[in-house]
Regions:
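Multi-pass alpha-helical transmembrane bundle typical of ion/small-solute transporters
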Residues: 1-339
């Protein structure tokens, strides 16, 4: 194979990896659509079809609102410069996609975000060991595995207590009528946070690939515009198709929600995502909204939360990073042997 042919093959490999990354982004929207719309559907504020269009719109609008701090963390802040190559990116994406498909099939609301982080970690470790990982980026990501659901829980429960006190003299029918309208605001805010944090993770891994292959300079402060637009379009399109198995778990099986509870859960989750995105931390939208839903349910009574379902979700969270890392390491090794 001469130089021109080798360059052409390399370009095709890069194009296929970009397509695979956008497929992951689409799947992220599909898999995590439930996070944005489960409460607004389960409370009857919007029909499922209306809800996915609503969420997809705000997923894309996030492109105009948030700085690309999360993309910078994923693209430049997790792995040592010079370690990433096409095999690493392939392994990372395959590990994340495989885990997403498994959890989607079983209707488990796991984290697409942490599946991607696990995939990156697994592929990088397979190539160069733990020394190739940047402790600062990995550290804050791991820390927020625990912080984001706890913060969502705290904000969701505080919002519920505050609203209950403010509205204590209002009739239940009046409260429901008011919060059916207000939940459109909270659902829109949460969908903004979902798009702003999650689309940037795919932007980050494509940017990582382009830097590694010389199509973007390591000193660039932002990724190419086409990458940003494509990633936000992909996650919005994925959200349009939805993930109804997970909607049922998130919106009904953990705890029954009224519009006021949906508003408090979405607002608590949205505030958590806005904070994390501003800090450049790739967090799990799934962890965040689940924590907020449990927080809202726990203010009613402990038995209002189906702790068995919540426990199964926690186990899926615990397994996400090691499982996706394991698949990514195998995928890296196989691709390295074949190409």
């Amino acid at each position: 194979m001469d130089t021109a042919q080798a360059a052409q093959v390399a370009l095709w490999v890069i194009a296929l990896l970009v397509a695979l990354a956008l497929a992951f982004d689409f799947m992220n929207g599909f898999h995590d659509a439930a996070n944005s719309i489960a409460t607004v559907v389960s409370t009857g504020v919007l029909r499922p079809t209306q809800a996915v269009v609503f969420a997809a719109f705000f997923n894309f609008v996030a492109i105009f609102i948030f700085h690309l701090s999360v993309a910078a963390t994923v693209g430049k802040g997790i792995v040592q410069p010079g370690v990433v190559d096409t095999h690493v990116v392939f392994g990372a994406l395959l590990g994340a996609i495989t885990w997403n498909l498994v959890t989607w099939y079983y209707g488990i609301p796991s984290s697409s975000s942490h599946a991607l982080i696990g995939g990156i970690v697994g592929a990088v470790m397979a190539k160069a060991g733990t020394g190739a990982l940047l402790s600062a980026g990995i550290g804050k990501t791991v820390l927020f595995i625990f912080v984001s659901p706890l913060l969502g829980f705290t904000l969701g429960s505080l919002m519920m207590v505050l609203v209950a006190n403010v509205m204590r003299k209002a009739s239940p029918s009046k409260v429901d009528r008011w919060f059916r309208r207000l939940q459109l605001v909270s659902a829109g805010a949460y969908s903004l946070g979902h798009g702003g944090n999650d689309a940037q993770k795919t932007i980050g891994i494509i940017w990582m690939l382009l830097i590694a292959t010389g199509y973007s300079a390591a000193g660039d402060t932002t990724p190419p515009t086409w990458v940003i637009i494509c990633c936000y379009m992909a996650i919005a399109a994925g959200t349009m198709f939805g993930g109804w198995r997970i909607v049922k778990t998130m919106g009904q099986k953990i705890t029954k929600l009224r519009p006021v509870g949906g508003f408090c859960a979405e607002t608590g989750g949205a505030l958590t995502l806005f904070l994390a995105t501003a800090l450049g931390i790739p967090v799990s939208t799934t962890h965040t909204i689940t924590g907020a839903i449990v927080g809202v349910g726990s203010t009613q009574r402990a038995s209002a939360v189906r702790w068995g379902v919540a426990g199964n979700i926690v186990w899926a969270w615990i397994l996400t990073i090691p499982a996706s890392a394991f698949v990514a390491a195998i995928a890296y090794w196989v691709s390295f042997q074949l190409y």
